[in-house]
Amino acid sequence: MYIVISILYITIKSLSIQNRIFYSVDLVTVFIFYMILYLRLSYALMFAILMGFSKELFSIGILGIIPLSYLISSAIIKVSSQFLDICSIPGRISTVSFAEMGKELIYILFILLYDFQCGAFLSIFKYLLLKALITGIVSVFIIPLLEKISRLLNERISQDSA
């Protein structure tokens, strides 16, 4: 279910960024946060790799950077969940924002390794900071929605098996 939703999201996002319809919010990071929080870590890591490679299908870049950045994002979520209260709203916002910021910084650092002509780093950093904050705020609304969907699916499965 998460993979289908994420592939649809990545497709819509790539089309909307080309047409500049809406601001970019990374729902894949929010799904990874949810999977680490409520499911197994191995599911979250596999999801991160699959979504990274599917995102690379729609972009032109160096193969493997996006999955690696999602894996680092997963590690940031796992480590920061030990220090922050991820059940509270500020903890969720800060954890998802840290993960998104780390993911984007790793992505930019790898691009800078291969292309040294990126001069507007400060303006990119401001954009990434705003994107990370918006993704963290949006995660507060999406996580309860995912919890409710998961609860409804579990109830449906238990009713069908009985």
Enumerate the language-model features and the residues they cover.
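Terminal, non-globular segments
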Residues: 1-162
